[in-house]
Amino acid sequence: MPFDCPAPPSRAACRTVFLSDLHLGAMGSRADLLLACLQARPADIYVLVGDILDLWQPLLPHWTAADQAVIDHLNARAAAGADLVYVRGNHDPEPDRAPPHARLHVRAVCEHIHRTGDQRRLLVVHGDSVDSRLVRTHLATRIGSLANHLLLRLDRGLRRLVEIGRAHV
């Protein structure tokens, strides 16, 4: 499926960009597409709404150059004066414990009040914070995350086999 992220009419066109559930470091992350979009649309404020990093797979890391480029881009934007707000998610409850190269230079919070251009106030939280814990336990969530990782790895391997088969036909 093609991805199109056209540049805005002016470089100041984006006041705020909200990013959620990027899962950088997970097998299914599409950091390459995200980076292209972030580079095309600079913003004054970046609100990172949880699960930016996927810190649940310490034994199965999948950190790519594209994942690192997204982190480097956001840190560079912050160094240039953009505001970065990091709202914790369930996959990154302690982002400051990420490996040094994967850390964003920002303080992580559980919730954030965002003020819009017309001064309305919006509460920003990660969706997992309001999920019902009666239906889903922490252990079940961890098992589901591991199963997802393994299925993505299997899918990637099968796709490679199909490509190899096509090349030999």
How should these model regions be labeled?
Residues 102-111, 118-123, 128, 132-140:
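Conserved beta-sheet core of the metallophosphoesterase superfamily
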Residues 15-23, 121-128:
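Active-site-proximal beta-strand elements of phosphoester/diester hydrolases
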Residues 10, 20, 29, 129-132, ...:
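Generic serine detector
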Residues 2-3, 9-15, 24-118:
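Core catalytic region of metal-dependent phosphoesterases/phosphodiesterases
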